[in-house]
Amino acid sequence: STPMSQKLFVHLKDPNDSEKLIALKKVASEHPGQEELILVLGEAAQKTALRMPFKVAIKDELTTALHEFFDPTAVAIK
C-alpha cells in the first residue's frame, strides 16, 4: 500500500511580501516532485490556502532551503 502523499504548507503572513513569494517559487522549482505545495496567506481568521500549480519533492533539502526565507514555524508537512 502506498502511504498517503504528504503536502507541504508554507505560511506567508503578509500576502504582499513579493520577495518571499519569489523565493518560494525559486526553491520549489529547484526541488520538483510529486507532492503538493500549499501556500497559506494571512493571519488567523483571515487565512487563505492556495494550492500552487507546481509540485515539489518533500525532502530535508527543500525544508532547509525554505527555512532560509521562512520561519521554521511557517513551514509544515502534513
Each model region followed by its residue ranges:
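Primarily single-stranded nucleic-acid-binding OB-fold modules
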Residues: S1-K78
